[in-house]
Regions:
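Conserved catalytic network of the ASCE P-loop NTPase/AAA+ motor domain
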Residues: 25, 56-59, 96-98, 128-130, ...
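Walker A/P-loop
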Residues: 214-254
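Solvent-exposed alpha-helical segments within well-ordered globular domains of core cellular machineries
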Residues: 3, 18, 42-54, 84-90, ...
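P-loop NTPase nucleotide-binding/switch module
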Residues: 167-204, 208, 238-289
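Walker B catalytic acidic pair
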Residues: 294, 300-301, 312
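Basic, amphipathic alpha-helical bundle interface domains used for macromolecular binding and assembly
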Residues: 34, 40-45, 60, 67-77, ...
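Peripheral, non-AAA+ core regions of ATP-driven protein-machinery
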Residues: 1-213, 217-223, 325, 465, ...
């Protein structure tokens, strides 16, 4: 007796077809799984055996061979439990094999027969929809699967309910799509007193999707400013929301099947390892930079990160994706992020403060700032000093302009960019390539002369030159200008200041 059930294997954000095949033959009873299974898949034998026993079914005393085809594709994860169990049930005649042929199945089994959540259901649903099949998944993830469009989803809480549905004796209700609840409001720019230059840089960064580095003493408000950024960014468009939710799904972080509408804001600790930041691990998983896709990656205390970890961000910041290579697989995750970083000018943080003079200056500052490589700094569009706030500033009334007003200007600038690049590929000025910059961001004659003189005086690299053009284009968009002018270039150049080096 033989039976087959369709399921998937995850490679990055791609779900590949896998066929679970079960063969029952005579011989000394044993249960074998072949087809490059990992430890979690191999252990599914005991979970499946116990789950079937919990609903009153015992495995036949035969040689049970489970093959996961194609055999050369690595199989990882616990979501193979359910398709293996269904394949066994079809092989012993407990359910109709023909009805199962119209579905893709994913889900982890408990020992009592319950079907519990497993990562990647949204990807499996999209794959099933593209294959003109339905999806069998855990009840807790039915809403997540229903976002894949017109798709027959059977979201069953346990094996008994699933068998009853397949036999037609008791149907499982179709799950409705559930959109994410609006998140609780974060800090407002109205709470930040002073720091007008930093607020302006934050607005420019939000409007164009530019990378930002804030440098200043402890307690100046760098982290608070970064936390205000999500409040002025526009919400995700439907296609972007699906991209972000797919990354969250494969990482197992899409709670309650709720599609993300708010742009991600990830803030890993400075002790984070390279796999934690860019992805990897024994079972390849998206890192923080991919979980921040189309959102913000905030690195506080930037020089405290390990230098190899920081340098691993250089390629993703340029390409918008990160590739993780293993001996038997190669996985690519999206990583189009807006990098926001904060750092102190030196280890003690008080360089240049006459009241709290650094005892090791200037050597302390040079050593501390040298922890961040020049190529990484060159990829940051906006460098802004955030000075300490005086007691007089703290006693002032709150500023009249808060996040809502800034968000409106940012949204207007983003709409200008969306109209400009419609059909060309980029979504923001930060994503524009050289051809797009030549077409849309070439300054007028005074602006070109200023940029040429500054490029020579500041020794701008080709990358730095293009980043100044991108920031200039964003400043012009915020000002409602059709053409990039000298004033826009001048402001953009003022943000190219880098930390002093010996």
């Amino acid at each position: 007796m033989a039976a087959t059930v369709a399921t998937v294997a995850y490679l990055g954000l791609e779900a590949r077809s896998v066929e679970v095949q079960v063969q029952l033959t005579s011989g000394v009873p044993r249960f074998t799984i072949v087809g490059l299974p990992d430890k979690a898949v191999a252990e599914s034998r005991e979970r499946v055996r116990a789950a079937l026993a919990a609903i009153g079914l015992a495995l036949p005393p035969k040689v049970i061979t489970v093959n996961l085809s194609p055999a050369d594709l690595p199989k990882e994860g616990s979501h193979y439990d359910l398709p293996i169990a269904l394949c066994l049930l079809a092989a012993i005649g407990a359910t109709d094999a023909e009805s199962l042929s119209h579905y893709v199945a994913v889900g982890e089994l408990c020992l009592d027969g319950r079907i519990t959540a497993s990562p990647g259901v949204l990807l499996a649903a999209l794959h099933a929809s593209g294959s003109d099949k339905g999806l069998i998944c855990p009840a807790a993830q039915g809403s997540e699967a229903s976002w894949a469009g017109e798709l027959d989803v059977i979201a069953a809480p346990d094996l008994l309910a699933l068998l009853a549905h397949l036999k037609g004796t008791s149907l499982v209700s179709p799950p409705p799509p559930v959109e994410a609840e609006p998140p609780e409001g974060g800090p407002d720019l109205a709470q930040v007193k002073g720091q007008e230059v930093a607020k302006r840089a934050l607005e420019i960064a939000a409007a164009g999707g530019h990378n930002l580095l804030m440098s200043g003493p402890p307690g100046a408000g760098k982290s608070l400013l970064a936390a205000c950024l999500p409040g002025i960014l526009p919400p995700l468009q439907p296609g972007e929301a699906l991209e972000v939710s797919m990354v969250a799904s494969v990482a197992g972080e899409l709670g309650g099947g709720k599609i993300r509408r708010k742009r991600p804001f990830r803030s890993p600790h400075h002790s984070a390892s390279m796999p934690a930041l860019v992805g990897g691990g024994l079972r390849v998983r998206p890192g923080e930079i991919s979980l921040a896709h189309l959102g913000v990656l905030f690195l506080d205390e930037l020089p405290e990160f390990q230098r190899p970890v920081l340098d691993s961000l250089r390629q993703p910041l340029e390409t918008g994706s990160v590739s993780v290579a293993r001996a038997n697989t190669h996985v690519t995750f999206p990583a189009r992020v807006q990098l926001v970083a904060a750092m102190n000018p030196c280890r003690c943080g008080h360089l240049g403060d006459p009241a709290l003079a650094c005892s090791r200056a200037p050597r302390c500052a040079a050593d501390y700032q040298a922890r961040v490589s020049g190529p990484l700094l060159d990829r940051i569009d906006l460098h802004v000093e955030v000075p300490g706030v005086s007691a007089a500033d703290l006693t002032l009334p709150p500023p009249a302009e808060g996040s809502a007003e800034v968000a409106r200007r940012v949204a207007a600038a983003r709409q200008v960019q969306a109209d400009r690049y419609n059909g060309h590929g980029p979504r923001t000025n930060a994503e524009a390539n050289g051809e797009m910059l030549d077409r849309f961001a070439t300054p007028d004659e005074p602006g070109r002369k200023l940029l040429a003189d500054a490029a020579a005086a500041m020794r701008l690299s080709a990358r730095g030159f293009h980043r100044v053009l991108r920031v200039s284009r964003t400043i012009a968009d915020l000002a409602g200008a059709d053409r990039v002018g000298r004033i826009h270039v001048a402001e953009a150049l003022s943000y190219r200041r880098q930390a002093p080096r010996n």
